[in-house]
Design a protein with these regions (language model features):
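Extended hydrophobic-aromatic, low-complexity segments
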Residues: 154-155, 168-169, 192-195, 210-212, ...
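Terminal RNA-binding accessory module
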Residues: 240-339
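Active-site proximal loops enriched in glycine and acidic residues that flank catalytic Cys/His/Asp
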Residues: 96, 132, 160-162, 198-202, ...
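Short flexible coil/turn linkers enriched for glycine and charged/polar residues
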Residues: 39-43, 53-55, 152, 162, ...
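Conserved SAM/AdoMet-binding glycine-rich loop
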Residues: 6, 86-212, 220-221
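Proteins enriched for Cys/Gly/acidic motifs involved in redox and nucleic-acid/cofactor modification
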Residues: 1-102, 156, 178-185, 189, ...
């Protein structure tokens, strides 16, 4: 970048922000560390609990960019949430490149369940939603917390990437097909009604038609409530870039991706259709010309389905309402307020 942009006076990496502050002639104040300027609607916020990643997935450049995993101190996270509640935030998306690693570096133990409990105990916290879990060595003691605490959403975003054992090995995922099935079955058994969101990849070097067909069978079998997918990209510096050839043609990758998403669209339509006639607690995000737009506890902002609410009753964005679902499409619900 320095060679390509000689007009730039100074570059700062994401970890040397103290140097930036120093160069600006300001001193760092610890008491300001958790103050936030919200860039989201005022009723929800993203709270990062860790930075970096210690995993060695073949295709991923995040560890190269962010470095080793660093858990934020638990007290710092709790203080940030308290401050956000004081600003009127009700819903918290707890995020990290790898939520499930939280605490292993700082506390020498998996501390995510404890952190979620502590945030859950804060008055004014209405919803907690978790992004992004890692499947291997998942902290199973998180599941009772999700099941028993009303303000912890029955929702888990956990990127699985693939199901074929040969692909999982080539991707360096440190989990098997059998272990993946066991994890998902246990989640659904221990947290009734949980909605699972996952991310899958097609076109990784070495993926055969048989591997792809196995992935399709897996998606049809598990029937994820929410799913995203993408085609493999040969990123410089990754293990895959150094050790594998990007041999699958781009058009094959795209065909596989399109087919996978068509399969999921049918599943999503069925999942949403099953909600017709049911009543859900919904938070209203915004008002549009013909309807209000809200979400249930099973829907994260920006990536999941929304519920479009008729304007029979005036509603306030940021407030909760009981909404009955009256119609459904693959990626949207339609409802009316009961209260």
């Amino acid at each position: 970048l320095e060679k390509e942009l000689p007009e730039v006076d100074r570059f700062y990496g994401k970890f040397n922000w103290k140097e930036l502050i120093s160069d600006l002639g300001k001193s760092y104040h610890q008491e300001l560390a958790t103050e936030r300027v919200l860039t989201t609607p005022r009723h929800y916020a993203y709270v990062k609990i860790g930075e970096g990643c210690n995993r060695t997935c073949s295709y991923c450049s995040i560890p190269i960019i962010t470095g080793a995993y660093q858990s934020r101190p638990m007290e710092e996270v709790v203080d940030e949430v308290r401050g956000l509640v004081a600003q009127g935030v009700k819903e918290f998306q707890m995020i990290a490149q790898d939520l499930t690693f939280y605490g292993l570096d700082r506390y020498k133990r998996m501390a995510l369940p404890e952190l979620v409990e502590r945030v859950s105990d804060i008055p004014g916290v209405e919803w907690i939603r978790l992004h992004y879990g890692y499947p291997s060595h998942f902290p199973y003691d998180l599941l009772p917390v999700m099941r028993e605490r009303d303000n912890v959403c029955k929702y888990m975003d956990i990127a699985l990437q693939h199901i074929s054992d040969p692909m999982l090995k080539m991707m360096r995922r440190n989990i098997t097909k059998a272990e993946t099935y066991e994890l998902l079955e246990r989640m659904r058994r221990e947290v009734p009604g949980i909605h699972l969101r996952t991310t899958l990849m097609v076109g990784h070097p070495g993926e055969t038609e048989q591997d792809f067909e196995e992935l399709i069978r897996f998606v049809k079998d598990i029937r994820f409530e929410r799913m995203g997918a993408f085609a493999y990209s040969h990123e410089e510096g990754t293990y895959a870039y150094q050790h594998y050839k990007d041999e699958i043609p781009q058009e094959v990758k795209q065909d596989r991706l399109d087919y996978l998403m068509r399969v999921q669209e049918g599943i999503s339509a069925d999942v949403n259709a099953s909600k017709v006639g049911q009543t859900f607690r919904v938070i209203v995000d915004r008002e549009e010309e013909d309807f209000y737009v809200g979400r249930t506890q099973y829907d994260s902002p920006e990536v999941d389905p929304e519920i479009l609410i008729s304007k029979d009753t005036p509603l306030s964005p940021g407030s909760f309402y009981q909404v009955k679902v009256i119609d459904a499409q693959a990626f949207d619900l339609y409802g009316k307020v009961l209260n």
